[in-house]
Amino acid sequence: MRLPYYFLSLLFPTILMGQAYIHPENNEAFLQNEVAEIHITVSQNHLNTLLGDSLYSNYHFPGVFRYESSSFSDTLENIGFRVRGNTSRNAQKKGFKISFNENVVGQKFKGIEKMNLVGQHNDPSLLRYWTSLYLLKKHELIASRMSFVKLYINSEYRGVYLNVEHIDDEFLQKRFINDDNGNLYKASWGADLNYWGANAASYKSVYELKTNKDSNDYSAFILFLDSLNNLSDGDFPCYMERNFEVNHYLKTLATEIIIGHWDGHAYNKNNFYLYRQPSNGKFIFIEYDLDNSFGIDWFGIDWANRDLNDWHETNRPLVERLLDVPYYKDVFNAHLDTMLSDLDSSSWYSVLAAKQNLIKSAVLSDTYYRKDYGFQYSDFLVGLDDNYGAHVKNGLAEYLDERITSGLGQIDLIGDLEPACDELTHEPARQIVKIVDFIGRETLFRTDIPLIIMYDDGTAEKVMVWGN
């Protein structure tokens, strides 16, 4: 079968035509080779209220922020400080949010307006969230920057925290250059992406508009949900290609499933953003809050062996309708195959071991690490390889090893290379000769998976090289 190259360009835009976003470099706010210190000073009365009557409030209490590293220090006054999270607000090791511009308009710390400090009280390894973001970035997907820090509040050491970049207008400006003024919707629990009617009020408690709040416009979002749920099977693929970053999402979904992030959209209808890019009107999917992953479990489900192609919960129209299209199911499985194969042959364990070594001295003196589940320092040291029991069904590396082995046996490539949308047209690309795998990565011959040979006349041919 010979296919016009422009179909590949349309279906694999982030690979063959350049992705529409960038990942900014780390700076002093996100140090990778040391554990910086954050010191928060607030009045004791305010701290008592913050941790007491105001625990479930998002009210910011005024304070002073000081940041200390081996080569850099800075102090910002009149910042806002509060508890963050959902169920984790009940934890002994709570998460916190710092808002640098809450009381001083335009105040930033190293280009960021807000800082999320995640306690990771469920995770004895303290590495699950970090590893999730690391893999999103490795897979060239949109991800927050992150770093480990030591947190002090009124001189009391509160433990090791993961500093996670906040998703807001500053986040968009650093990733969508000259295309950052669109609507950003934050989806919390209940976000199944079903159509709930034309009234915007029906959506606002679950899908919070985080940018352009004055216009308060949900019209394009509601139209997208209406179309996602109600278009015919024949019209669905072309609509999605015009209005949603399909390949980016299929790649994100593959990552979400591989890491066992059940607290995201596909299983728990939770924890994601949708951003509508002004330049093309397309929505793009962004993950956040990825700490419940890599074998953390409250449902009695074996996430390390769960079927990759039947992993999601029911009543998820975005996942179900996309994977009902044979072409998209193949693209999804090709992403899974590539990611699992890369993990199988990479040195990811040494990356995790190095990060564990970086933070271990800070964990040793973290008394809050022990307060929620009785974790001991010894549990941290074996957190990569051994399960803790209870809700921690796998060590992080133990989970990955098991997921790679089981996952490679669950790949389901149909081999259907017909484009999902055949009415889009595009001029043929410039002359090119190369071999790519099914998701557009230049490669050598591999056995038992589809490969695409691209010719200098703008056509392409699918081949299979069978193993023994």
Locations of regions flagged by a protein language model:
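Internal "kinase-insert"/substrate-recognition segments embedded within catalytic cores
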Residues: 97-105, 119-120, 139-144, 156-259, ...
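A conserved helix-loop-beta module that forms one wall/lid of the active-site cleft
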Residues: 120-154
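Middle-to-C-terminal accessory/interaction subdomains
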Residues: 20, 27-28, 35, 46, ...
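Bacterial Sec-dependent N-terminal signal peptides
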Residues: 1-21, 421
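Conserved NTP-binding catalytic cores of kinases and kinase-like/nucleotidyltransferase enzymes
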Residues: 19-125, 131
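A general beta-strand register signal
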Residues: 66-68, 152, 437, 454
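C-terminal tail/sorting-segment detector
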Residues: 450-468
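Residue-level detector of functionally pivotal "anchor" positions at catalytic/ligand-binding pockets or at interdomain
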Residues: 410-443, 468
